[in-house]
């Protein structure tokens, strides 16, 4: 960030002055600043020679500052690489700001300065590139939570995100026990697990007139055959099973990301198509084809096995109290 500031200052110095008079004033101020720095350096040098302890503290401080600058620069390089490798998919909104929030940049530089490992540098690099793509993704609170996240909780969250669909993950796919989910909740990454939440499938009909339950997005989803109904679906009053019929609707329990968790999930690679495929397999149980992953193609809606008689694309599920 500091390197960018210096580059910007040079650009202003070259093109930002309107006429020769202002350029002269600017240069005079620069010369004065350089003289003040030189004078300060001389005074500091004399003090260091007279006080060995001060010299040692100064050397330690300079070394620390140099390491911090290297950490920031390395994180910045990784952010630039990520932007080059993964350009924004859509057009930039008309109201998108031209510059990033200075408060965000200051806080990001503070945290990135402590990134001593390649993994942590990559994390802060992705955070910066994500914020550049979509300003406002990371609040100051989110940055603080991410900085304070311990290694064990970070690993748990990565496991959670491997089953993520949008802002939630199906309980059917989560390989996390109650204590691990509680750790994510206490870290502020998911919403309170005690209050059950569920998504509701919509009902649809395929080209042969067969009835299905469907859930997904504009591009892909999962469809569940109503007859015969998979054995993984349970029925009955006061039923809180992961996949159940309630009020004549198919509901599926999910764990939901918090705002902080949703922002952090953006920088964690995951394959949503593979998640839908896994979900279809789990729901099918011992009945092959009872649930299928579907996707939208140029030819229309296709099931994972290539069938063109897949049910219409479902709408994204709305999370409700279970």
PLM feature spans:
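Non-transmembrane, amphipathic alpha-helical segments
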Residues: 108-112, 141, 145, 176
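Short amphipathic alpha-helical interface segments
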Residues: 138-173
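Eukaryotic partner-binding/assembly regions in large regulatory complexes
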Residues: 3-125, 304-305, 310, 316-322
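Accessory beta->alpha helical hairpin/"wing" motif in late/C-terminal subdomains of nucleic-acid enzymes
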Residues: 102-112, 118-132, 191-282, 286, ...
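Long, low-complexity, charge-rich intrinsically disordered regions
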Residues: 278-322
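Extended alpha-helical scaffold and adjacent linker segments that couple domains
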Residues: 1-16, 20, 27-29, 33-61, ...
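Basic amphipathic alpha-helical segments that dock to polyanions
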Residues: 175-191, 196
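Generic structural signal for hydrophobic core residues of well-folded globular domains
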Residues: 4, 111-115, 127-131, 146-149, ...
């Amino acid at each position: 960030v500091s390197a960018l500031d210096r580059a910007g200052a040079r650009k202003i110095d070259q093109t930002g002055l309107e006429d020769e008079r202002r350029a002269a004033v600017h240069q005079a101020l620069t010369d004065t600043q350089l003289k003040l720095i030189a004078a300060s350096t001389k005074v500091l040098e004399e003090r260091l020679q007279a006080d060995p302890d001060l010299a040692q503290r100064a050397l330690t401080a300079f070394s620390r500052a140099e390491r911090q600058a290297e950490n920031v620069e390395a994180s910045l390089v990784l952010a630039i690489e990520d932007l080059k490798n993964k350009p924004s998919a859509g057009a930039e909104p008309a109201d998108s700001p031209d510059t990033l929030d200075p408060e965000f940049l200051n806080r990001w530089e503070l945290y990135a300065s402590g990134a001593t490992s390649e993994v942590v540098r990559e994390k802060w690099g992705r955070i910066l590139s994500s914020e550049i793509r979509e300003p406002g993704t990371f609040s100051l609170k989110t940055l603080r939570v991410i900085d304070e996240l311990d290694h064990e909780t970070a690993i748990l969250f990565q496991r959670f995100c491997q089953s993520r669909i949008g802002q939630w993950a199906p309980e059917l796919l989560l390989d996390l026990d109650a204590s691990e989910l509680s750790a994510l909740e206490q870290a502020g990454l998911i919403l309170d697990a005690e209050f059950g939440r569920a998504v509701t499938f919509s009902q649809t009909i395929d080209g042969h007139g067969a009835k299905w339950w469907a859930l997904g997005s504009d591009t892909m989803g999962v469809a569940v055959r109503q007859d015969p109904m998979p054995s993984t679906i349970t029925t009955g009053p006061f039923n809180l099973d992961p996949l159940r019929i309630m009020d004549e609707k198919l509901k599926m329990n999910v764990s939901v990301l918090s705002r902080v968790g949703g922002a952090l999930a953006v920088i964690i690679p995951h394959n949503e198509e593979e998640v839908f495929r896994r979900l279809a397999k789990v729901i099918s149980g011992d009945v092959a084809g009872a649930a299928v992953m579907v996707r939208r193609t140029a030819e229309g809606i296709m099931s994972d096995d290539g069938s063109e008689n897949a049910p219409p694309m479902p709408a994204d599920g709305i999370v409700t109290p279970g």
